[in-house]
Swiss-Prot record:
One of the record's GO molecular function terms: acetylglutamate kinase activity
Gene for this chain: argB
Organism: Shewanella sp. (strain MR-7)
Any GO CC annotation of this UniProt entry: cytoplasm
Gene3D superfamilies, sorted: Acetylglutamate kinase-like
Name of the protein: Acetylglutamate kinase
Pathways per UniProt: Amino-acid biosynthesis; L-arginine biosynthesis; N(2)-acetyl-L-ornithine from L-glutamate: step 2/4
Binding locations of substrate: 46-47, 68, 160
Length: 260
């Protein structure tokens, strides 16, 4: 068994759900790590599925600075696409790889506190760590939590939370190592080349230049926040090469390291 007690928090984007081979490779890698004693927590988005479901219902997708605007009438569809379909697709892939998983959302187990992030965004939530008991129990059994980014306020109102921010908060809660996985190999410079390491100052400069924008801006800023909070680098890497995860579990650098 591995002596690595740190939880590996893997955030996966919606694009993964549309790539069966990518999902299978990622889950096989996660299964091997869990068998070796590594605790793994997966957090997911599902933007592609949400867009499809909204379009099927004649509703428009609007984004503000890389974040999805969530009007009240869209909330049931978004919750269904994320906490329902997306979550179960990933759970199915985990089961196929021999992983015992628990499908959950941010609303479960008193795990986080949630509030409205910005009135302009509608029912978009901002969450903060609350109670790790539920997650720690699941992880202690050798099971893998697969968490969607649907949260709930104290009055029962569902909120849509950006999945990168959700992963950041859960990494804080369990004191884990955060890896933000997308369909790109990391943060790319203006010429499309991978940047191996970035500091907060360099990120601010690249945002100013428009090199880092939209979804990647949200991702990198979430990574920087948790890197600073935990005093350790956060990785932004690709799920397309799941073998990178094994290197990461061994403490090797992959993708772009966001420095605290």
């Amino acid at each position: 068994m591995s002596t690595n007690n740190s939880v590996l928090v893997l955030k996966v984007g919606g694009a993964l759900l549309q790539c069966e081979m990518g999902m299978a490779r990622l889950m096989d890698t996660a299964a091997a790590m869990i068998a070796n004693g590594q605790q793994v927590l997966m957090v997911h988005g599902g933007g592609c599925l949400v867009d499809e479901q909204l379009a099927a219902n004649g509703m428009e997708t609007v984004k503000l600075e890389g974040l999805r605007v969530t009007p009240p009438e869209q909330m049931p569809i978004i919750a269904g696409a994320l906490a329902g379909t997306s979550n179960k697709i990933l759970q199915g892939a985990a089961t196929k790889a021999g992983i015992v998983s628990v499908g959950m959302s941010l609303a479960d187990g008193n795990t986080v506190s949630a509030k409205i992030k910005d009135e302009r965004l509608g029912l978009v939530g901002e969450v903060s760590p609350k109670d790790a008991t539920y997650l720690k129990f699941i992880l202690s059994q050798g099971w893998m939590p697969i968490c969607s980014s649907i949260a709930m306020m104290d009055d029962g109102q569902m909120l849509n939370v950006n999945a990168d921010q959700a992963a950041t908060v859960l990494a804080k809660l369990v004191g884990g190592k955060l890896v933000l996985l997308s369909d790109v190999s990391g943060v790319l410079d203006g010429k499309g080349q991978l940047i191996p390491s970035l500091t907060g100052q360099q990120i601010a400069e690249l945002v100013k230049q428009g090199v880092i924008e939209k979804g990647m801006k949200v991702k990198v800023e979430a990574a920087l926040e948790v890197a600073q909070w935990m005093g350790q680098a956060v990785q932004v890497a690709s799920w397309r090469d799941a073998s990178q995860l094994v290197a990461l579990a061994k403490g090797e650098a992959v993708g772009t390291q966001i420095q605290p």
